Amino acid sequence: GYGLTRIPHLNKDLAFTLEERQQLNIHGLLPPCFISQDIQVLRVIKNFERLNSDFDRYLLLMDLQDRNEKLFYKVLMSDIEKFMPIVYTPTVGLACQQYSLAFRKPRGLFISIHDRGHVASVLNAWPEDVIKAVVVTDGERILGLGDLGCNGMGIPVGKLALYTACGGVNPQECLPVILDVGTENEELLKDPLYIGLRQRRVRGPEYDDFLDEFMEAVSSKYGMNCLIQFEDFANINAFRLLKKYQNQYCTFNDDIQGTASVAVAGILAALRITKNKLSDQTILFQGAGEAALGIAHLIVMAMEKEGVPKEKAIKKIWLVDSKGLIVKGRAALTNEKEEFAHEHEEMKNLEAIVQDIKPTALIGVAAIGGAFSEQILKDMAAFNERPIIFALSNPTSKAECTAERGYTLTQGRAIFASGSPFDPVTLPSGQTLYPGQGNNSYVFPGVALAVVACGLRHITDKIFLTTAEVIAQQVSDKHLEEGRLYPPLNTIRDVSLKIAEKIVRDAYQEKTATIYPEPSNKEAFVRSQMYSTDYDQILPDGYSWPEEAQKIQTKLD
């Protein structure tokens, strides 16, 4: 009846047939009109296009997700290049900043530090019994925007929307979670509309015990092969939690490993332009947080695969943090940074560092808008015939340089990629270049699909190198000529399928899969797991019997 039209994964709106409306007792609750899903998509797109701001477009799509889930994903998949920047970066950053103001309907699970000792009970409130993927954040480092506390829930929600749209993971089996331990954001603490706990962040043993309880509760309820993706945790927690849980649970950190994989994929594609090996590069990072260190470690692993000893590979990588170049003997270096500290004088100015190190590749992941100055870009072009310049920080306002500056200040010779989308750039020569967007969405949907499909218990760093290689293989020579270092976003579902197929194939070879019998056709097996946006048959299967068999007996023998 009426309640059915309020259940997002069952609601079809005006696509309910007359028979469905009559038998489900919703006839009369809908206008006397029957339209296809394709026409429904057209209506959404027309409404989308008449809105003036991306934030309003975001709200439109979120309302649709809360009303008609199949249609929401049909719309996203109809033009993923158009809709991804709305449901995820960069618009999701603005949405998180406005999350309390725009709050309409809760989506996901809100677990607070005051629920310690009862996390399992809170999980029981979730209506779905089968969950295969969880995305969790504590809201402390949302994109490049800092501590947004409970407002960070927009990130797990948006991330899981892309699990489905880009990877085909069933949305009914996905769970977005915010762990609310407080916030250090003064504006939020004073905001009467803020939806989270009004207290300073809990840290130390109490925080760790809370995380332990959460991980144990999720794995106990949903199984050891339930994927738990960590998202937007602060640097002080991200590395140690990954290290702590990686071999204990089915988990990964997208900010560290997902970013690393997509960045390395871009570098591997760039090497087809520079015509040399990864181990021939000198790589300088602006930033030394989760993203930079994750990329650096995966580059080392890729160089080792080329046959370069680990110690030699590490020497090819330099990092710059807020205090300057990371060198041996510098005070207060973390263990993670210490690994990439080299013998060199201390330097603070990025322009001077670039002139001194003369990198072949410059990678920005520090969320400092405009950090790649005109001088730096011109120097990169002076040192290299084809300089590799990746401005990977999100959102767009935090990008180290725009695509236009990246190309024009290097006479169009830069091999450029960014974290947020940029428009194509037409050079004075008339050539149009399409900057590659190093979006983690090339990575995590395929990895998640593979984990769900074959029941992986642990997600190793090797999986992310494999993923990078598969992504790079999907880039054609024509794409490279156009400046693209990544496959077109509109092929992302096919890319995810290829990633998942390769990971699943390796998992069965290495005996790490847990779902048996082993499928003979891995591609068909993975494809069969992918979510369909077609409306489900709601009515019971109806069929006829022979007329003779249906005769009603009226006389007693």
From Swiss-Prot:
Keywords: Cytoplasm, Metal-binding, NADP, Oxidoreductase, Phosphoprotein. It comes from Sus scrofa (Pig). This is NADP-dependent malic enzyme. It is an enzyme of class 1 (oxidoreductase). The record marks 255 as: Important for activity. A divalent metal cation binds at residues 231-232, 255. Pfam families: malic, Malic_M. The modification Phosphoserine is found at residue 322. GO terms for cellular component: cytosol; mitochondrion. GO terms for molecular function: magnesium ion binding; malate dehydrogenase (decarboxylating) (NADP+) activity; malic enzyme activity; manganese ion binding; NAD binding; oxaloacetate decarboxylase activity. Divalent metal cations. Prefers magnesium or manganese. NADP(+) binds at residues 141, 255, 394. The active site is at 88 (proton donor), 159 (proton acceptor). CDD domains: NAD_bind_1_malic_enz. Its cofactor is Mg(2+); Mn(2+). Transmembrane segments: none annotated. Catalyzes the oxidative decarboxylation of (S)-malate in the presence of NADP(+) and divalent metal ions, and decarboxylation of oxaloacetate. Homotetramer. Belongs to the malic enzymes family. Its EC number is 1.1.1.40.
